[in-house]
Amino acid sequence: MSPKKKILLVEDDNALSSVYESRLDLEGFDVATVANGEDALSKAVEFKPDLIVLDAMMPKINGFDVLDILRNTPETTNVRVIMLTALSQPTDKERAKALGADDYLVKSQVVISDVVERIRHHLGIDQ
């Protein structure tokens, strides 16, 4: 049996974070959660996730800046990143893609099963 894929969930809404963490755990992932951009950066290096689910609007350091730093840090430059945010403007999606996001999902337009499906897709896991 292969080791569990590691997911770092970066979300400042505790209720949403708890729901996503529970579902991802049930799906068989090893999940770590943090609630702000500063903690995301240190946890990404320490935890060595296979994929990061990253909110955009967070305290301390926003998700776009976190993404930029991740892409310019040798230990995290190749980690898959899915931005999961309330920001729905095309310019926000373009900014995320330009900074190196692998995917961009708008919270109001997806349900948790959609997010799990995208995670599996980016990790090359069959349903």
Enumerate the predicted regions with their spans.
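Two-component/phosphorelay signaling modules centered on CheY-like receiver
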Residues: 14-32
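Helix N-cap/capping motif at the beta->alpha junctions
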Residues: 33-42, 63
